[in-house]
Amino acid sequence: MPAIRKATRGDACRLAEIEIFNYRLNFYPYFRTDAYFFSELNVSALMQAYRDMPERIEHTFVYDDGVVKGFVRINGAEIEKLFVEPAFQGQGIGGALLDHAIRHAGADWLLVLEKNEGAIRLYERHGFRLTEQRHRVDDTEEYLVRMER
């Protein structure tokens, strides 16, 4: 039976895999920095960061049905990260994690890449609305937009 539970250090490898795969899938097409996405950004280093920095896991919840398929990280009222393993997207996992963040942690805002239309649609289905706030991503032409409930 699927469960949403608090992440543990033992989840570090899956958290890192899911995050890396999503970064490459969702952000590489816009930022196209090969050295970062395919060298600096790697599962081994991120897994170690999860293990070495308990604050990365402290407010992270995983969707687990025998295999960790996605996770959400909350920072105060912000949904800081929400990722589902690409192979399992479209099965309601992201929505379940989002509902958990809203109901159990009081999350009510997030930042999302303006061009990530799929994520924006998911958030809108769960009561989030785009605001006028936009933040340029470093020295790029890309923007993060704020969504609130």
Q: What label would you give each PLM region?
A:
Residues 3-17:
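A short beta-loop-alpha structural element at the N-terminal edge
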Residues 57-70:
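Conserved beta-hairpin
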